[in-house]
């Protein structure tokens, strides 16, 4: 399956159902009156973390996700049915961004609210009072939340395998786990992160084979920053370095890899790390190993020839890797953010655009919410709309801008002549 770790989508939660204007008129019923029911809630959109997924490919073709609308209210005070919620599976490690701000980090196999459905509108039964026993007032359902989101996947792995291209990372992953990565004798065989579950005794951990890094990866060279971000999720790092092949310099390779990690995120160097010195069966190995130990005496090194490793060697490697995940190692810092707490501050409740031909266009989130919520289907609703608009100062502002009788005013889809 194609690996996709970044997509942009639009989510539109369901609209709430409209409340209705209705009166009870039945023979032999002496207590009639308003009985218009409320609209149902619009359906919300949830993302659900799924450990069985490892790509955002399903979103690559589905750019828009729509929630189900709530049903309108009915007579006899009946509330409309709620719109069905939508639950969409996403890979663990998916981050959700709104206008470049992280709003949700999906790290657990549970549901996360992404877009909330709109509240259902009230029917005229709710507007009865001692002064108005037969109100012709109702509300439309609110629109569901509508967001343009960027989804970014950072694989959830305990240990990341890093190294230069063709160093043996894929071979190692195939030996210690059930993963079957592509293995070949040329550079950049691995073009996307490969995950494998490593079992050791009664425990297990997840290892990620990350595409080979070259000098300048942090600034975009090679696979570059596209895959460096996946290392941020790891709790430990294993360097796989070729110590035996001709024209290889393990010291230079190790320094370059650490430099790229540091440039990308300095915190990566705080993670527990070991080096697997690969190709110990080749002539240059001992010479390179001795030089490396002199340069980095504190670095833990495991000698191996991965291509011909015996089972006991593989078990030792697994034990050493598992040891990196001890209690003293740094814990991954993860922040879960509740999207329902996001608020948008309006600079102004409305914006007026005027033209020389006596045309005024009104826009703005607050005025849009008012015009959307109050249906102009009765005299009482029109009066209610007029009172709310007057309260926010729209009429006064139009007068200041020189509006004249007969001028046309448009508020989204609603138009009227000024009188």
UniProtKB/Swiss-Prot annotation:
Residues 1-156 form the Obg domain. Residues 342-419 form the OCT domain. Its cofactor is Mg(2+). InterPro entries: G_OBG (IPR031167), GTP-bd (IPR006073), GTP-bd_Obg/CgtA (IPR014100), GTP-bd_prot_GTP1/OBG_C_sf (IPR036346), GTP1-OBG_CS (IPR006074), GTP1_OBG_dom (IPR006169), GTP1_OBG_dom_sf (IPR036726), OBG_GTPase (IPR045086). CDD domains: Obg. Belongs to the TRAFAC class OBG-HflX-like GTPase superfamily. OBG GTPase family. An essential GTPase which binds GTP, GDP and possibly (p)ppGpp with moderate affinity, with high nucleotide exchange rates and a fairly low GTP hydrolysis rate. Plays a role in control of the cell cycle, stress response, ribosome biogenesis and in those bacteria that undergo differentiation, in morphogenesis control. NCBIfam families: Obg_CgtA, Obg_CgtA_exten, PRK12297.1, PRK12299.1. This is GTPase Obg. It comes from Mesomycoplasma hyopneumoniae (strain J / ATCC 25934 / NCTC 10110).
